[in-house]
Amino acid sequence: MSDEHHSGLLYGLEQRIPPLPAFFSALQHVLAGLVGIITPPLIIGATLGLGDWLPYLISMSLLASGIGTFLQSNRVWGIGAGMICMQGTSFAFLGVTVAGGMWVKAQGGGPQDMMAMLFGVNFVAALVPVIVSRFIEPLKKIFTPIITGSVIALIGISLIKVSVINWCGGEKAEDFASMNNIALGAGTLGVIVLLSCAKNRWLRLSSVVVGIAVGCIAAGLSGQFHLHSLGDTLFRLPTLFPLGFQFNSAIFLPVALVSLVCILEAVGDLTANSLISQQSVDDRAFRNRLKGGILADGVSCMVAAMLCAFPNTTFAQNNGVIQMTGVASRYVGRYIGVILILLGLFPPVGELLRQIPAPVLGGATMVMFGCVVAAGIRIITQTPLSRRDVLIVGLAFGAGLGVESVPAFLSHFPPMVGDLFGSAATSGGLVAIALNLILPQEQAATKSLRSQDDRAES
Protein backbone atom coordinates (compact mmCIF):
# COMPACT_ATOMS: atom_id res chain seq x y z
CA MET A 1 0.00 0.00 0.00
CA SER A 2 1.13 3.56 -0.61
CA ASP A 3 2.06 6.03 2.09
CA GLU A 4 -1.15 7.90 1.30
CA HIS A 5 -3.24 4.88 2.24
CA HIS A 6 -1.30 4.37 5.48
CA SER A 7 -1.93 8.00 6.36
CA GLY A 8 -5.66 7.81 5.62
CA LEU A 9 -5.48 9.55 2.23
CA LEU A 10 -7.11 7.87 -0.75
CA TYR A 11 -5.32 10.20 -3.18
CA GLY A 12 -2.13 12.10 -2.31
CA LEU A 13 -1.27 15.65 -3.31
CA GLU A 14 0.40 14.82 -6.63
CA GLN A 15 -1.61 11.68 -7.36
CA ARG A 16 -3.91 11.89 -10.39
CA ILE A 17 -7.52 10.96 -9.75
CA PRO A 18 -10.05 9.54 -12.25
CA PRO A 19 -12.67 12.03 -13.52
CA LEU A 20 -15.73 10.62 -11.74
CA PRO A 21 -14.31 10.52 -8.19
CA ALA A 22 -12.63 13.87 -8.89
CA PHE A 23 -16.00 15.38 -9.79
CA PHE A 24 -17.70 13.99 -6.68
CA SER A 25 -14.89 15.25 -4.47
CA ALA A 26 -14.97 18.69 -6.13
CA LEU A 27 -18.73 18.95 -5.77
CA GLN A 28 -18.41 18.44 -2.02
CA HIS A 29 -15.91 21.30 -1.79
CA VAL A 30 -18.31 23.52 -3.74
CA LEU A 31 -21.25 22.62 -1.51
CA ALA A 32 -19.17 23.32 1.60
CA GLY A 33 -18.12 26.78 0.38
CA LEU A 34 -21.10 27.94 -1.67
CA VAL A 35 -22.90 29.79 1.12
CA GLY A 36 -19.67 31.49 2.17
CA ILE A 37 -19.11 32.77 -1.37
CA ILE A 38 -22.55 34.27 -1.98
CA THR A 39 -23.32 35.61 1.52
CA PRO A 40 -20.93 38.64 1.55
CA PRO A 41 -22.30 40.12 -1.71
CA LEU A 42 -25.84 39.56 -0.39
CA ILE A 43 -25.04 41.44 2.84
CA ILE A 44 -23.13 44.25 1.13
CA GLY A 45 -25.73 44.60 -1.61
CA ALA A 46 -28.61 44.78 0.85
CA THR A 47 -26.81 47.29 3.09
CA LEU A 48 -25.74 49.64 0.29
CA GLY A 49 -28.97 49.40 -1.71
CA LEU A 50 -27.54 47.44 -4.63
CA GLY A 51 -30.59 45.19 -4.99
CA ASP A 52 -30.78 45.44 -8.79
CA TRP A 53 -27.14 44.35 -9.05
CA LEU A 54 -27.29 41.41 -6.64
CA PRO A 55 -27.71 38.65 -9.28
CA TYR A 56 -24.72 40.02 -11.19
CA LEU A 57 -22.61 40.37 -8.03
CA ILE A 58 -23.36 36.78 -7.00
CA SER A 59 -22.55 35.40 -10.45
CA MET A 60 -19.26 37.29 -10.62
CA SER A 61 -18.34 36.18 -7.10
CA LEU A 62 -18.74 32.55 -8.15
CA LEU A 63 -16.80 33.15 -11.36
CA ALA A 64 -13.92 34.92 -9.57
CA SER A 65 -13.81 32.17 -6.94
CA GLY A 66 -13.55 29.55 -9.68
CA ILE A 67 -10.70 31.33 -11.44
CA GLY A 68 -8.84 31.80 -8.15
CA THR A 69 -9.29 28.15 -7.16
CA PHE A 70 -8.03 27.01 -10.56
CA LEU A 71 -4.94 29.21 -10.16
CA GLN A 72 -4.22 27.87 -6.67
CA SER A 73 -4.27 24.21 -7.72
CA ASN A 74 -2.22 24.55 -10.91
CA ARG A 75 0.67 26.74 -9.72
CA VAL A 76 1.53 28.26 -13.10
CA TRP A 77 4.53 30.65 -13.14
CA GLY A 78 4.72 30.34 -9.36
CA ILE A 79 1.14 31.59 -8.87
CA GLY A 80 -0.71 29.20 -6.58
CA ALA A 81 0.05 26.85 -3.71
CA GLY A 82 -0.29 23.72 -5.84
CA MET A 83 -2.92 22.32 -3.45
CA ILE A 84 -6.71 22.17 -3.16
CA CYS A 85 -7.12 25.75 -1.97
CA MET A 86 -10.65 26.91 -2.59
CA GLN A 87 -11.00 30.66 -3.06
CA GLY A 88 -14.12 32.47 -1.92
CA THR A 89 -15.47 35.90 -1.04
CA SER A 90 -13.92 37.13 2.20
CA PHE A 91 -16.11 38.16 5.15
CA ALA A 92 -13.23 40.21 6.56
CA PHE A 93 -13.87 43.07 4.13
CA LEU A 94 -17.56 43.55 4.99
CA GLY A 95 -17.02 46.46 7.39
CA VAL A 96 -14.57 48.47 5.30
CA THR A 97 -16.56 47.82 2.11
CA VAL A 98 -19.83 49.06 3.60
CA ALA A 99 -18.04 52.07 5.14
CA GLY A 100 -16.48 52.92 1.77
CA GLY A 101 -19.80 52.62 -0.02
CA MET A 102 -21.50 54.85 2.55
CA TRP A 103 -18.78 57.47 2.07
CA VAL A 104 -19.42 57.54 -1.68
CA LYS A 105 -23.15 57.73 -1.03
CA ALA A 106 -22.63 60.68 1.33
CA GLN A 107 -20.79 62.48 -1.48
CA GLY A 108 -23.88 62.13 -3.67
CA GLY A 109 -22.82 59.01 -5.56
CA GLY A 110 -25.26 56.36 -6.76
CA PRO A 111 -24.94 52.55 -6.85
CA GLN A 112 -22.71 52.57 -9.93
CA ASP A 113 -20.42 55.21 -8.40
CA MET A 114 -20.16 53.15 -5.22
CA MET A 115 -19.20 49.99 -7.08
CA ALA A 116 -16.75 51.76 -9.39
CA MET A 117 -14.98 53.18 -6.33
CA LEU A 118 -15.07 49.99 -4.26
CA PHE A 119 -13.78 47.72 -7.01
CA GLY A 120 -11.12 50.24 -8.04
CA VAL A 121 -9.86 50.42 -4.45
CA ASN A 122 -10.03 46.62 -4.09
CA PHE A 123 -7.96 46.19 -7.24
CA VAL A 124 -5.16 48.38 -5.89
CA ALA A 125 -5.37 46.82 -2.40
CA ALA A 126 -4.85 43.40 -3.99
CA LEU A 127 -1.23 44.46 -4.51
CA VAL A 128 -0.70 44.04 -0.74
CA PRO A 129 -0.66 40.20 -0.76
CA VAL A 130 1.18 40.23 -4.09
CA ILE A 131 4.01 42.28 -2.53
CA VAL A 132 4.03 40.42 0.80
CA SER A 133 4.31 37.08 -1.02
CA ARG A 134 7.79 38.12 -2.16
CA PHE A 135 8.98 38.39 1.46
CA ILE A 136 7.87 35.07 2.95
CA GLU A 137 11.41 34.06 3.95
CA PRO A 138 11.99 37.08 6.25
CA LEU A 139 8.48 36.66 7.70
CA LYS A 140 8.82 32.98 8.59
CA LYS A 141 9.76 33.90 12.19
CA ILE A 142 6.35 35.54 12.56
CA PHE A 143 4.31 32.69 11.08
CA THR A 144 5.28 30.06 13.65
CA PRO A 145 3.21 26.88 14.29
CA ILE A 146 1.67 28.28 17.48
CA ILE A 147 0.49 31.39 15.61
CA THR A 148 -0.76 29.71 12.43
CA GLY A 149 -2.30 26.87 14.45
CA SER A 150 -4.13 29.30 16.74
CA VAL A 151 -5.45 31.24 13.76
CA ILE A 152 -6.75 28.17 11.93
CA ALA A 153 -8.37 26.81 15.12
CA LEU A 154 -10.10 30.16 15.72
CA ILE A 155 -11.29 30.22 12.11
CA GLY A 156 -12.80 26.78 12.62
CA ILE A 157 -14.53 27.83 15.84
CA SER A 158 -16.02 30.87 14.06
CA LEU A 159 -17.23 28.64 11.23
CA ILE A 160 -18.87 26.26 13.71
CA LYS A 161 -20.99 29.17 14.92
CA VAL A 162 -22.16 29.75 11.34
CA SER A 163 -22.86 26.03 10.97
CA VAL A 164 -25.00 25.91 14.12
CA ILE A 165 -27.00 28.98 13.01
CA ASN A 166 -27.73 27.29 9.68
CA TRP A 167 -28.55 24.03 11.46
CA CYS A 168 -31.21 25.92 13.44
CA GLY A 169 -32.69 27.23 10.18
CA GLY A 170 -30.83 30.47 9.55
CA GLU A 171 -30.76 33.75 11.48
CA LYS A 172 -34.11 35.05 10.18
CA ALA A 173 -35.97 31.73 10.23
CA GLU A 174 -39.38 31.88 11.90
CA ASP A 175 -38.93 28.29 13.08
CA PHE A 176 -35.39 28.89 14.37
CA ALA A 177 -34.10 25.90 16.39
CA SER A 178 -37.35 23.97 15.90
CA MET A 179 -37.19 20.21 16.40
CA ASN A 180 -37.77 19.67 12.68
CA ASN A 181 -34.70 21.75 11.83
CA ILE A 182 -32.58 20.06 14.50
CA ALA A 183 -33.64 16.59 13.32
CA LEU A 184 -33.00 17.47 9.67
CA GLY A 185 -29.48 18.70 10.38
CA ALA A 186 -28.73 15.77 12.68
CA GLY A 187 -29.89 13.28 10.05
CA THR A 188 -27.68 14.90 7.41
CA LEU A 189 -24.72 14.91 9.77
CA GLY A 190 -25.30 11.28 10.73
CA VAL A 191 -25.32 10.08 7.12
CA ILE A 192 -22.11 11.96 6.34
CA VAL A 193 -20.30 10.61 9.42
CA LEU A 194 -21.35 7.02 8.68
CA LEU A 195 -20.25 7.21 5.05
CA SER A 196 -16.98 8.96 5.97
CA CYS A 197 -16.09 5.99 8.20
CA ALA A 198 -16.88 3.43 5.48
CA LYS A 199 -14.06 1.34 4.04
CA ASN A 200 -15.52 1.62 0.53
CA ARG A 201 -13.73 4.53 -1.15
CA TRP A 202 -16.76 5.49 -3.23
CA LEU A 203 -18.92 5.88 -0.13
CA ARG A 204 -16.22 7.99 1.50
CA LEU A 205 -15.68 10.08 -1.64
CA SER A 206 -19.37 10.90 -1.97
CA SER A 207 -20.22 11.20 1.74
CA VAL A 208 -21.09 14.93 1.69
CA VAL A 209 -23.02 14.79 -1.59
CA VAL A 210 -25.04 11.77 -0.47
CA GLY A 211 -25.64 13.28 2.97
CA ILE A 212 -26.94 16.54 1.48
CA ALA A 213 -29.07 14.63 -1.04
CA VAL A 214 -30.62 12.53 1.74
CA GLY A 215 -31.20 15.71 3.76
CA CYS A 216 -32.92 17.44 0.82
CA ILE A 217 -35.16 14.41 0.24
CA ALA A 218 -36.09 14.32 3.92
CA ALA A 219 -36.76 18.08 3.84
CA GLY A 220 -38.98 17.65 0.78
CA LEU A 221 -40.97 14.84 2.38
CA SER A 222 -41.47 16.90 5.54
CA GLY A 223 -42.51 20.01 3.60
CA GLN A 224 -39.37 22.02 4.42
CA PHE A 225 -37.92 22.16 0.90
CA HIS A 226 -39.71 24.05 -1.88
CA LEU A 227 -38.01 24.91 -5.17
CA HIS A 228 -38.54 28.51 -6.27
CA SER A 229 -37.94 30.24 -9.58
CA LEU A 230 -34.39 29.84 -10.90
CA GLY A 231 -34.45 33.24 -12.62
CA ASP A 232 -34.78 34.34 -16.23
CA THR A 233 -31.08 34.76 -17.12
CA LEU A 234 -29.69 31.48 -18.45
CA PHE A 235 -26.19 32.75 -19.29
CA ARG A 236 -24.22 35.74 -18.02
CA LEU A 237 -21.12 36.92 -19.91
CA PRO A 238 -18.66 38.91 -17.75
CA THR A 239 -17.02 42.19 -18.71
CA LEU A 240 -13.97 43.83 -17.12
CA PHE A 241 -14.59 46.92 -14.97
CA PRO A 242 -18.14 47.30 -16.36
CA LEU A 243 -18.77 50.37 -14.19
CA GLY A 244 -15.42 52.09 -14.62
CA PHE A 245 -12.49 52.56 -12.23
CA GLN A 246 -12.27 55.06 -9.38
CA PHE A 247 -9.87 55.41 -6.46
CA ASN A 248 -9.73 57.23 -3.14
CA SER A 249 -6.86 57.00 -0.67
CA ALA A 250 -9.13 57.46 2.38
CA ILE A 251 -11.07 54.33 1.42
CA PHE A 252 -7.94 52.48 0.32
CA LEU A 253 -6.07 52.60 3.66
CA PRO A 254 -8.50 50.50 5.75
CA VAL A 255 -8.99 48.05 2.87
CA ALA A 256 -5.21 47.65 2.58
CA LEU A 257 -4.91 47.02 6.32
CA VAL A 258 -7.59 44.33 6.20
CA SER A 259 -5.77 42.80 3.22
CA LEU A 260 -2.65 42.61 5.37
CA VAL A 261 -4.52 40.92 8.21
CA CYS A 262 -6.11 38.42 5.79
CA ILE A 263 -2.62 37.20 4.88
CA LEU A 264 -2.33 35.83 8.42
CA GLU A 265 -5.53 33.81 7.93
CA ALA A 266 -4.28 32.59 4.54
CA VAL A 267 -1.02 31.37 6.10
CA GLY A 268 -3.02 29.43 8.67
CA ASP A 269 -5.25 27.88 6.00
CA LEU A 270 -2.30 26.93 3.80
CA THR A 271 -0.42 25.42 6.75
CA ALA A 272 -3.43 23.30 7.74
CA ASN A 273 -3.93 22.25 4.12
CA SER A 274 -0.30 21.14 3.86
CA LEU A 275 -0.53 19.18 7.10
CA ILE A 276 -3.78 17.42 6.13
CA SER A 277 -2.29 16.66 2.70
CA GLN A 278 0.64 14.93 4.43
CA GLN A 279 3.18 17.56 3.36
CA SER A 280 5.99 19.05 5.43
CA VAL A 281 5.32 22.42 7.03
CA ASP A 282 8.95 23.24 7.75
CA ASP A 283 10.97 23.12 4.54
CA ARG A 284 11.64 25.16 1.41
CA ALA A 285 8.84 23.43 -0.52
CA PHE A 286 6.37 24.56 2.14
CA ARG A 287 7.63 28.15 2.01
CA ASN A 288 7.26 28.06 -1.77
CA ARG A 289 3.68 26.88 -1.31
CA LEU A 290 3.06 29.79 1.06
CA LYS A 291 4.63 32.23 -1.38
CA GLY A 292 2.59 30.94 -4.31
CA GLY A 293 -0.62 30.69 -2.28
CA ILE A 294 -0.48 34.27 -1.00
CA LEU A 295 0.47 35.51 -4.46
CA ALA A 296 -2.55 33.68 -5.90
CA ASP A 297 -4.72 35.29 -3.22
CA GLY A 298 -3.64 38.70 -4.50
CA VAL A 299 -4.11 37.80 -8.16
CA SER A 300 -7.53 36.32 -7.32
CA CYS A 301 -8.54 39.59 -5.64
CA MET A 302 -7.44 41.51 -8.73
CA VAL A 303 -9.53 39.24 -10.95
CA ALA A 304 -12.50 39.66 -8.59
CA ALA A 305 -12.23 43.47 -8.71
CA MET A 306 -12.06 43.47 -12.51
CA LEU A 307 -15.17 41.27 -12.71
CA CYS A 308 -17.17 43.37 -10.20
CA ALA A 309 -16.81 40.97 -7.27
CA PHE A 310 -15.57 41.57 -3.74
CA PRO A 311 -12.12 40.42 -2.48
CA ASN A 312 -11.35 36.71 -2.29
CA THR A 313 -9.45 34.70 0.28
CA THR A 314 -8.44 31.08 0.83
CA PHE A 315 -11.30 29.20 2.48
CA ALA A 316 -10.69 26.95 5.48
CA GLN A 317 -13.76 24.82 4.73
CA ASN A 318 -12.03 22.71 2.13
CA ASN A 319 -9.48 21.51 4.69
CA GLY A 320 -12.32 19.72 6.46
CA VAL A 321 -13.49 18.17 3.19
CA ILE A 322 -9.98 16.86 2.47
CA GLN A 323 -9.88 15.34 5.95
CA MET A 324 -13.25 13.63 5.50
CA THR A 325 -12.91 12.35 1.94
CA GLY A 326 -9.21 11.49 2.06
CA VAL A 327 -8.68 13.21 -1.30
CA ALA A 328 -5.78 15.68 -1.29
CA SER A 329 -5.01 15.50 -5.03
CA ARG A 330 -4.45 19.02 -6.29
CA TYR A 331 -6.04 18.00 -9.59
CA VAL A 332 -9.42 18.12 -7.83
CA GLY A 333 -8.87 21.88 -7.57
CA ARG A 334 -9.25 22.13 -11.34
CA TYR A 335 -12.66 20.52 -11.13
CA ILE A 336 -13.69 22.83 -8.29
CA GLY A 337 -12.60 25.83 -10.35
CA VAL A 338 -14.51 24.69 -13.44
CA ILE A 339 -17.69 24.00 -11.43
CA LEU A 340 -17.57 27.45 -9.82
CA ILE A 341 -16.91 29.11 -13.18
CA LEU A 342 -19.93 27.33 -14.68
CA LEU A 343 -22.06 28.36 -11.70
CA GLY A 344 -21.06 31.96 -12.38
CA LEU A 345 -21.74 31.77 -16.10
CA PHE A 346 -25.03 29.86 -15.70
CA PRO A 347 -26.92 31.52 -12.79
CA PRO A 348 -29.84 29.01 -12.62
CA VAL A 349 -27.47 26.23 -11.50
CA GLY A 350 -26.09 28.33 -8.67
CA GLU A 351 -29.60 29.40 -7.70
CA LEU A 352 -30.64 25.74 -7.48
CA LEU A 353 -27.79 24.96 -5.08
CA ARG A 354 -28.55 28.11 -3.08
CA GLN A 355 -32.01 26.76 -2.29
CA ILE A 356 -30.66 23.79 -0.32
CA PRO A 357 -32.35 24.04 3.12
CA ALA A 358 -30.20 25.78 5.74
CA PRO A 359 -30.49 22.93 8.32
CA VAL A 360 -29.13 20.48 5.75
CA LEU A 361 -26.13 22.72 5.06
CA GLY A 362 -25.64 23.30 8.79
CA GLY A 363 -25.52 19.60 9.56
CA ALA A 364 -23.26 18.92 6.57
CA THR A 365 -20.74 21.62 7.43
CA MET A 366 -20.59 20.91 11.17
CA VAL A 367 -18.18 18.00 10.86
CA MET A 368 -16.06 19.81 8.24
CA PHE A 369 -15.62 22.88 10.41
CA GLY A 370 -14.85 20.68 13.40
CA CYS A 371 -12.05 19.13 11.34
CA VAL A 372 -10.69 22.65 10.73
CA VAL A 373 -10.43 23.19 14.50
CA ALA A 374 -8.72 19.82 14.88
CA ALA A 375 -6.23 20.76 12.15
CA GLY A 376 -5.36 23.95 14.03
CA ILE A 377 -4.79 22.06 17.27
CA ARG A 378 -2.64 19.58 15.39
CA ILE A 379 -0.44 22.39 14.07
CA ILE A 380 -0.05 23.90 17.56
CA THR A 381 1.01 20.57 19.07
CA GLN A 382 3.57 19.60 16.40
CA THR A 383 6.27 20.21 19.00
CA PRO A 384 6.14 20.22 22.83
CA LEU A 385 4.81 23.54 24.13
CA SER A 386 6.93 25.64 26.47
CA ARG A 387 5.43 27.85 29.17
CA ARG A 388 5.87 30.78 26.80
CA ASP A 389 4.02 28.95 24.02
CA VAL A 390 1.13 28.05 26.32
CA LEU A 391 0.84 31.69 27.39
CA ILE A 392 0.74 32.90 23.78
CA VAL A 393 -1.82 30.30 22.71
CA GLY A 394 -3.97 30.91 25.79
CA LEU A 395 -4.09 34.68 25.32
CA ALA A 396 -4.67 34.31 21.57
CA PHE A 397 -7.67 32.09 22.20
CA GLY A 398 -8.86 34.36 24.99
CA ALA A 399 -8.73 37.45 22.77
CA GLY A 400 -10.24 35.71 19.76
CA LEU A 401 -13.09 33.97 21.57
CA GLY A 402 -13.71 37.02 23.73
CA VAL A 403 -14.32 39.28 20.73
CA GLU A 404 -16.34 36.54 19.02
CA SER A 405 -18.54 36.02 22.10
CA VAL A 406 -19.02 39.70 23.01
CA PRO A 407 -18.77 41.87 19.85
CA ALA A 408 -19.83 44.92 21.90
CA PHE A 409 -16.37 44.83 23.51
CA LEU A 410 -15.12 46.90 20.55
CA SER A 411 -18.20 49.11 20.22
CA HIS A 412 -16.52 52.25 21.62
CA PHE A 413 -13.30 51.86 19.64
CA PRO A 414 -12.77 53.64 16.30
CA PRO A 415 -14.32 51.77 13.34
CA MET A 416 -10.83 50.93 12.04
CA VAL A 417 -10.10 48.95 15.23
CA GLY A 418 -13.37 47.08 14.87
CA ASP A 419 -12.52 46.14 11.29
CA LEU A 420 -9.08 44.84 12.26
CA PHE A 421 -10.02 43.03 15.49
CA GLY A 422 -13.66 42.18 14.80
CA SER A 423 -13.14 38.48 14.06
CA ALA A 424 -11.74 35.75 16.30
CA ALA A 425 -9.01 34.83 13.83
CA THR A 426 -7.67 38.35 13.29
CA SER A 427 -7.83 39.47 16.93
CA GLY A 428 -6.35 36.20 18.22
CA GLY A 429 -3.74 36.12 15.47
CA LEU A 430 -2.60 39.70 16.00
CA VAL A 431 -2.36 39.17 19.76
CA ALA A 432 -0.31 36.01 19.17
CA ILE A 433 2.06 37.83 16.80
CA ALA A 434 2.52 40.72 19.25
CA LEU A 435 3.25 38.38 22.17
CA ASN A 436 5.60 36.27 20.08
CA LEU A 437 7.63 39.37 19.26
CA ILE A 438 7.54 40.86 22.78
CA LEU A 439 7.90 37.94 25.19
CA PRO A 440 11.49 36.79 25.71
CA GLN A 441 12.46 33.36 24.45
CA GLU A 442 12.99 30.68 27.08
CA GLN A 443 16.60 29.70 27.63
CA ALA A 444 17.66 26.46 26.00
CA ALA A 445 19.05 25.25 29.33
CA THR A 446 15.68 25.71 30.97
CA LYS A 447 13.97 23.75 28.21
CA SER A 448 16.57 21.00 28.44
CA LEU A 449 16.20 20.78 32.22
CA ARG A 450 12.43 20.56 31.93
CA SER A 451 12.73 17.79 29.34
CA GLN A 452 15.02 15.83 31.67
CA ASP A 453 12.53 16.26 34.52
CA ASP A 454 9.72 15.04 32.27
CA ARG A 455 11.71 11.95 31.30
CA ALA A 456 12.58 11.26 34.95
CA GLU A 457 8.93 11.44 35.96
CA SER A 458 7.95 9.06 33.17
Language-model features, listed with the residues they occupy:
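Intrinsically disordered, low-complexity non-transmembrane regions of multi-pass membrane transporters
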Residues: 1-24, 229-240, 275-292, 438-458
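N-terminal signal-anchor module of multipass membrane proteins
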Residues: 1-84, 95-107
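Hydrophobic, membrane-embedded alpha-helices of multi-pass small-molecule transporters
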Residues: 20-33, 177-189, 207, 222, ...
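Short, non-helical or kinked segments that cap or interrupt transmembrane helices
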Residues: 52-57, 78-93, 141-149, 204-209, ...
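Membrane-embedded alpha-helical modules
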Residues: 102-228, 335-449
